[in-house]
C-alpha cells in the first residue's frame, strides 16, 4: 500500500489536530462536575460514561496522520490506567498542554531536543517534590475519601470499598461482579476458598444447603491421582481412631478409592469428603503448597520422596471449619504456623514484584490474598445494563485509585498538588535558553488540570488558578461545593501514584511528539461507489 509522508511543521500541525480532538473529547469528563460522554456501539445499547479511558478507547479518526496523534494520546491514558487505574483524564490534559505549548516554541525557532531535555528535567524535579508533599494513608476514612472521588463523588461506592478493605486488609483481593438485582453489596469470603467442589454428592452433610460441613478436620494433601484403596488404608485407619473428619485434596480420586470412601461415609464409619486439587500444572503445585502451609500439613508428593501408603497423622493439615459445595471449597482457620505463613506471603510478594506478566501477577495476588486474610466481592447492582456498565467502570476506577493511595500515599486533590510543585522548578540548572523554555512549558502545564476542572464546573480558570497560587499548603478550590478551603480536611485527595504516573506518561509522549520531524502513514482511502450501484438504479427505474 502506498504511504503518505509529511515533514516538519505540517507533520506536527496534523498530529496536533489529532491530539486536540482526542484530548477535548476526554477532558470534558474531568472533575466532580465533569460531563458524560455517550458512545454509540455497533451492537447493543449505547454506553454512557464519565471515565476518561473508556472515551479514549472508542476514538478513531478518519485522517491517518491525525489518527496517529490521537492514538499516541490514547497511549498516555492507557499507560496511566495500567499503572494506577485512574488519572487518565489528568494525563491527557497534561499531555495536550505540554505538546501545544511546545509546538508554538518549535515554530518560533526553538530546538525540539533542548525543549525535551528541559521538560524532562522539570518533570524529575516536580515528581520529587510531589513525593515530599505526599502523606501516608492512616485510616479507613481517608481510604473512603479517595474511593469516593475516583468513583465520581459517589459516597456509597467509597464507603463500600473502605469496608471491603477493612475486612480483607490492604493485601486482600477485592473483585467486582455484577449483582442479580439492583442492590449493591459487599460479600467477604474469609479463609482460603478455591474453585473445586465435592467429587460425589454422597459427601454432603447438610442436605438443605447441599454442602459438606467438616469441623475440626484433618486435611490430606496429595499431588497425584488416587485410584487404589490400598494406598489410602493406613492413613484412614489412623484417622478413624481419632474420630475426626477428613478432607482429601488430590489431583483426582476415582474408581475403587472413591467408591470405598463413599461407602464408609454412608455407613457412618468415617466422616470424609474429597475434592480435586485447584489449578493446573506448576500453579497447582504452588497452590497445594499454599494449602499445606496454611493448614500446617505436608504435600504428599513422590517427587519429594513422600509416599501415600507411608503417610501418618503428622503429614496432615488441620482446619477449624471446612465448607464444600458443588463448586467451591472453603477452609477457615487453618492450623499452620504464623511464621511459616508470613514467610510464604513474603515469597509471593517478591514474585509479584519480579513478574512482568499481568496474568501471572493477578494469579499471584489471588494466592497472596487467600493466605493473608480473604477475598471481598463487590456485587454491583443497577436497573439497566447501561447503568451497570457505567457503575462497574467507576467501581474499578475507585478500587485501583485506593490501592495506589495505599502504596504511595495521597496529596491534595483538585489539581492543587501539581500547583504546589511549581516552586521546585526555580533552581534547575540549564545549559541553554531552550531548556529553560522547556521548564516554563511544564510550569504552565501544571495549571492545566485545575483550569479544566474549574471550566467543567462553569468557573473562570485563570482567576481561580491565580488565587490558589497566592495561597499555600492544601488550600484549594473544591469544585463540587464551589468553596475555597483546605482540600485535605474536606476529603478532596488524590493518590500520589496516580498524579505521578499521569505527569510522567504525559511528559514522555508529549516530548516525543515535539521531537517528531517526519510522519509516515497509510494513504487515505477514497470512498468508492459500490459495485453494480448504477445498474441497480436503472433496474429499479424500469420496475416503476
Swiss-Prot record:
Annotated GO biological process: protein refolding
Single GO term (MF): isomerase activity
Superkingdom: Bacteria
Record bears the keyword Cell cycle: no
GO CC aspect terms: cytoplasm
Catalytic activity of the protein: ATP + H2O + a folded polypeptide = ADP + phosphate + an unfolded polypeptide
Protein's cellular compartments: Cytoplasm
Self-association state and partner proteins as the record states: Forms a cylinder of 14 subunits composed of two heptameric rings stacked back-to-back. Interacts with the co-chaperonin GroES.
General function of this protein: Together with its co-chaperonin GroES, plays an essential role in assisting protein folding. The GroEL-GroES system forms a nano-cage that allows encapsulation of the non-native substrate proteins and provides a physical environment optimized to promote and accelerate protein folding.
NCBIfam families: GroEL, PRK00013.1, PRK12849.1, PRK12850.1, PRK12851.1
Protein name: Chaperonin GroEL
Species whose genome carries this gene: Amoebophilus asiaticus (strain 5a2)
